[in-house]
Curated annotation (Swiss-Prot):
Major localization class: cytoplasm
Stored Gene3D superfamilies: Aldolase class I
GO biological process, one term: isoprenoid biosynthetic process
Cofactor: FMN; NADPH; Mg(2+)
Subcellular location: Cytoplasm
Purpose: Involved in the biosynthesis of isoprenoids. Catalyzes the 1,3-allylic rearrangement of the homoallylic substrate isopentenyl (IPP) to its allylic isomer, dimethylallyl diphosphate (DMAPP).
Residues annotated for substrate binding in this entry: R9, K10, S100, Q101, R102, Q167
List of residues binding Mg(2+): E168
EC number: 5.3.3.2
Protein name: Isopentenyl-diphosphate delta-isomerase
Length: 371
């Protein structure tokens, strides 16, 4: 019964993301970040190079498709979405992450909805498991065994452990067993030979948490900040009674804005960062890269074409973002992503106010080029 509920929940999550407005009511903060226009770029636009390296692999664009779904039969919607996105990622040579594989652990016959190697043999594929399942008080506590199963069954190159305390706290059947997760992450990292990515799910990562994650050997952080898909909003639509809806509504806009989280994590650690959370155009993405992100992550913008099986629609959206990034780079005189991280930035408004209280802003602006 529990396993069936997990699968039903995954289906409901997809349905609400496709049919409802599940985005935060507040911005992700990048409107407070400005480039300084360069009237003499002293470069040719055609020479701009968008390639990046991440976890030992070279990619054609600084964009990845982050985990969204899985957990039904291959021919059903979750499998269709994953296969469509994987084929697009293969064509573009960018990383792709599947959604939570908990359903696959609990109901192994759903594994095919996550398997994409037959259509995307060369992509950098990232598996996905939830942090609360590694808590010391979890009912069915996961171990290194489940991590290796999640990776090897779908032939992934890395594993993301998603941190979603906000979603779990407002979910009627939520798992809030987070005690002991950091220790479990340390054990995972010391026991497997695959990169481990710590991934938020729309509420952002603080500098304190980032430092803890770096201390246990995590290889990269997907900050997934406030300003994009709100999983509290998704749970608001799933809730069956008014009290649970009231709680989910109250926390709809909880979290750390993406731009703020990015600056905090870049200032506090040396880890590669995936900047996701409301990334909806190439100008915003260029700002994130200039602020120190290694990659920009997207999910919701490509969900609808993926649900239709429209590979070229997904490719077209991402190439459009890439062209916008390239245009920004031309206008600030950056030949490549490394040079983009060294161009002047002006940070204003709420983002500046927050960062002045939380980090050494001038030091951060001088050290954005760590990766």
């Amino acid at each position: 019964m529990k396993e069936e509920l997990t699968i039903l929940r995954k289906f409901e999550h997809i349905e609400h993301c496709l049919k409802r407005n599940v985005e935060a009511h507040v911005s992700n903060g990048f409107e407070d970040v400005y480039f300084v226009h360069k009237s003499l770029p002293e470069i040719d636009k055609d020479e701009i190079d968008l390639t990046v390296e991440f976890l030992g692999r070279k990619f054609d664009y600084p964009i990845m498709i982050t985990g969204m779904t899985g957990g039904t039969r291959r021919e059903e919607i979750a499998g269709k979405i994953n296969r469509t996105l994987a084929m697009a990622a293969e064509e573009l040579n960018i990383p792709f992450g599947v959604g939570s594989q908990r359903a696959m652990i609990e109901k192994p016959e759903t594994w095919e909805s996550y398997y994409v190697r037959d259509v995307a043999p060369d992509i950098f594929l990232i598996g996905n498991l939830g942090a609360p399942q590694f808590g010391k008080n979890a009912k069915k506590r996961y171990s290194v065994k489940e991590v290796l199963y999640a990776i090897e069954k779908i032939e992934a190159d890395a594993i993301a452990i998603h941190m979603n305390p906000l979603q779990e706290s407002v979910q009627p059947e939520g798992d809030t067993t987070y005690a002991g997760v950091l220790e479990a992450l340390a054990e995972i990292k010391s026991s497997i030979n695959y990169p481990v990515i710590a991934k938020e799910t729309g509420a952002g990562v603080s500098k304190e948490v980032a430092i803890e994650l770096e201390s246990v050997g995590i290889d990269a952080i997907d900050i997934s900040g406030l300003g994009g898909t709100s999983w509290s909003a998704v749970e608001y639509y799933r809730a069956k009674d008014s009290e649970k809806r009231k709680i989910a509504l109250k926390f709809w806009d909880w979290g750390i804005k993406t731009a703020i989280s990015l600056a905090e994590v870049r200032w506090a650690t040396n880890l590669p960062i995936i900047a996701s959370g409301g990334m909806r155009d190439g100008v915003m993405m260029a700002k994130a890269l200039a602020m120190g992100a290694s990659l920009v992550g997207i999910a919701l913008p490509v969900l609808r074409p993926a649900a239709r099986g429209d590979v070229e629609g997904v490719v077209r959206i991402i190439r459009g973002y890439a062209e916008e990034i390239k245009n920004v780079m031309f206008l600030v005189g950056a030949r490549n992503i490394r040079e983009l991280r060294r161009v002047p930035l002006v940070i204003t408004g709420f983002v500046r106010e927050w960062l002045l209280q939380r980090i050494d802003l001038n030091s951060y602006l001088r050290s954005r080029f760590k990766h």
